[in-house]
């Protein structure tokens, strides 16, 4: 491959600031160091050329590495200074093999911005898969890992990048780093397989969580625009860095929001440039760093991992002298004056003041209060007696009470989750969501009930006490965002469609207020609706849970107002049948006889 081609591939993931207009390759080569440099190239190649093999890419990476060295020489080639997106596309399009193998002919017939959009759209259509498919036994993985650590991690990056073309490269590399840490720990254990199975499940959960957060942010940006994203990020980072001033935080949030559109579109060149600019500027502000311990620690990370570190920061201690509560009424004259001239600034200041005082709150609780406060200010600030008007308008709205009430709600959910087995709690969620949206498919409701269980299980376990609220509501809101985006809400029912079109912070409350759908016309409840046979005698808990949930789904759809007592009766009969037939000599014959009886008895119960 010619130098132009090598250079193009190399700078696909150039993470340089706009001010570094010259010799971009040398700067990233210096900052990321050789291994980080090669990893970034690998992610970019794998994400954009999914039908190429690792063998196809290895020579390109080696040549690109050599080009990086030349770009840092005393006489760097002119190609080091060219536009990165144009270079990458030109290089790929000059290779008939790459174009044909990765179906890029249509894109390569375009030029300039049209070609860039085509490349981004092409990547967006590549199927995604979050699973870790390297299902070799731990012993084999450990042998490969110990034999050549870098090669093993490289193969992981290649496979994961191909399956997740829209994930920002820094996220892919953070995931690869985590997977390497799992192997480093487990390969030194006597029971490597047990260690690996346990840690892999935890690691997979962490991946799903991070991807859900990124997906939700993109969905929110697409549906609600910059204003809501800015409000979310202002809450998030004000909670993390309460020592920073409102002006400092507002400036930082503006830069964060500027990265969302390119990162969500799949334009990773611009995404990484914007992120690099953001992190560089934030980490260069010694005034903020001296007061924000978490940020200061993250800024000591290498260029590849700083951004992920900042996103994962825990809240710093609150500044000395900060009042426990924020009273919007105490300075209402100044608030109204600012609101009249620049309403977004006034609302940003209010959100900031609440957020720095309440790291135990979710973003949604603060935004719900802010929405009420905004309505009060709109109504009152032009009035002569605006102070009294605002007091009256917000008389029933208290942020501290909202936080307490929501925290108590999740604590009760945690208690309910702890009081029963994991399977029974998941089944109860299946019942709840089938009642309010019986039109949804089993697969949809299975996913929803599983997600709610996973969120509460993780948050109740990992975030005890008052921090359960931001953990649980953030994750459940992410799940709602994904559900409303992945499926046509109007195809489920008008109530769900209405809630999906509510304001961002009100979606979950809206769904919780939905009553069982009594207008749904269910299919006939008969034996053909269920398949219950010897497969129920398996010891696989997942298969058993799935079977139990399918029965509940069918029964509750038939009567969304069925009582809990009737459900318990049906569940008892189901387990009695299962125990009887699994103990029978001819299991199939037993199920053939008993399953229709169970369905018939269940049908009679739902008529009551």
Curated annotation (Swiss-Prot):
Alphabetical keyword list: Disulfide bond, Glycoprotein, Lipid-binding, Metal-binding, Repeat, Secreted, Signal
Cell compartments where the protein resides: Secreted
Propeptide stretches in the record: 15-18
Gene3D superfamilies xref list: 1.10.246.10
One GO term describing the cellular component: blood microparticle
Disulfide topology: 26-72, 71-80, 93-108, 107-118, 142-187, 186-195, 218-264, 263-271, 283-299, 298-309, 336-381, 380-389, 414-460, 459-471, 484-500, 499-510, 537-582, 581-590
GO molecular function: lipid binding; metal ion binding
Glycosylation site positions: 501
Signal peptide: 1-14
Entry-linked SMART domains: ALBUMIN
Organs and tissues of expression: Plasma.
Domain Albumin per the UniProt entry, residue ranges: 19-205, 206-398, 402-600
Top-level division of the source organism's lineage: Eukaryota
Name of a matching Pfam family: Serum_albumin
Biological role: Binds water, Ca(2+), Na(+), K(+), fatty acids, hormones, bilirubin and drugs. Its main function is the regulation of the colloidal osmotic pressure of blood.
Homology family: Belongs to the ALB/AFP/VDB family.
Designated name of the protein: Albumin 2
Organism annotation: Salmo salar (Atlantic salmon)
Lineage: Eukaryota, Metazoa, Chordata, Craniata, Vertebrata
Gene name, Swiss-Prot/TrEMBL: alb2
């Amino acid at each position: 491959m010619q130098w132009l081609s090598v250079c193009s591939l190399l700078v696909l993931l150039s993470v340089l600031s706009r001010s570094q207009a010259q010799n971009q390759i040398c700067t990233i080569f210096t900052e990321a160091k050789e291994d980080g440099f090669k990893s970034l190239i690998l992610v970019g190649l794998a994400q954009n050329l999914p039908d190429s093999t690792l063998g196809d890419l290895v020579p390109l990476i080696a040549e690109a590495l050599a080009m990086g060295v030349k770009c840092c020489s005393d006489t760097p080639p002119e190609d080091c200074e060219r536009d990165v997106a144009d270079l990458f596309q030109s290089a790929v399009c000059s290779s008939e093999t790459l174009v044909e193998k990765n179906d890029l002919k249509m894109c390569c017939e375009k030029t300039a911005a049209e070609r860039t959009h085509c490349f981004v759209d092409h990547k967006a259509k590549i199927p995604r898969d979050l699973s870790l498919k390297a299902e070799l036994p731990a012993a084999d993985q450990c042998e490969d890992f110990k034999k050549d650590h870098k090669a093993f991690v490289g193969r992981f990056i290649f496979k994961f990048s191909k399956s997740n073309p829209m994930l920002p490269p820094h996220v892919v590399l953070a995931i690869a780093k985590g997977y390497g840490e799992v192997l480093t720990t487990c390969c030194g254990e006597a029971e490597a397989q047990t260690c690996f199975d346990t840690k892999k499940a935890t690691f997979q959960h962490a991946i799903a969580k991070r991807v859900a957060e990124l997906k939700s942010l993109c969905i929110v940006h697409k549906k609600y625009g910059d204003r809501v994203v800015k409000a979310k990020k202002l809450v998030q980072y004000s909670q993390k860095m309460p020592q920073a001033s409102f002006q400092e935080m507002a400036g930082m949030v503006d830069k964060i929001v500027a990265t969302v559109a390119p990162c969500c579109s799949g334009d990773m060149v611009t995404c990484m440039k914007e992120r690099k600019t953001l992190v560089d500027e934030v980490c260069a502000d010694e005034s903020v760093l001296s007061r924000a311990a978490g940020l200061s620690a993250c800024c000591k990370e290498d260029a590849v991992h700083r951004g992920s570190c900042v996103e994962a920061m825990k809240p710093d201690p609150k500044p000395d002298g900060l009042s426990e509560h924020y009273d919007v009424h105490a300075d209402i004259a100044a608030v109204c004056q600012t609101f009249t001239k620049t309403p977004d600034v006034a609302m940003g200041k209010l959100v900031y003041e609440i957020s720095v005082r309440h790291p135990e709150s979710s973003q949604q609780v603060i935004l719900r209060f802010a929405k009420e406060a905004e309505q009060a200010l709109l109504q009152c600030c032009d009035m002569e007696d605006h102070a009294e008007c605002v007091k009256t308008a917000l008389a029933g709205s208290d942020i501290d009470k909202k936080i307490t009430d929501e925290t108590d709600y999740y604590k009760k959910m945690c208690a309910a989750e702890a009081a029963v087995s994991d399977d029974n709690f998941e089944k109860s969620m299946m019942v709840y969501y089938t009642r309010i949206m019986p039109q949804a498919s089993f697969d949809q409701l299975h996913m929803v009930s599983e997600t709610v269980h996973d969120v509460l299980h993780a948050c109740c376990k990992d975030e005890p006490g008052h921090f359960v609220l931001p953990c649980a509501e953030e994750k459940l809101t992410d799940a709602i965002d994904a559900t409303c985006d992945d499926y046509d809400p109007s195809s489920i029912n008008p109530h769900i469609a209405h809630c999906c079109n509510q304001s961002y912070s009100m979606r979950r409350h809206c769904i919780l207020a939905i009553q069982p759908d009594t207008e749904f016309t269910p299919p006939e409840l008969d034996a053909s609706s269920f398949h219950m046979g010897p497969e129920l005698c398996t010891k696989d808990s997942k298969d058993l849970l799935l079977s139990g949930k399918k029965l509940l789904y069918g029964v509750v759809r038939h009567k969304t107002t069925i009582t809990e007592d009737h459900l318990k009766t049906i569940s008892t009969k189901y387990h009695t049948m299962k125990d009887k037939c699994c103990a029978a000599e001819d299991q199939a014959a037993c199920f053939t006889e008993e399953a229709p009886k169970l369905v018939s008895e269940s049908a009679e119960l739902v008529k009551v």
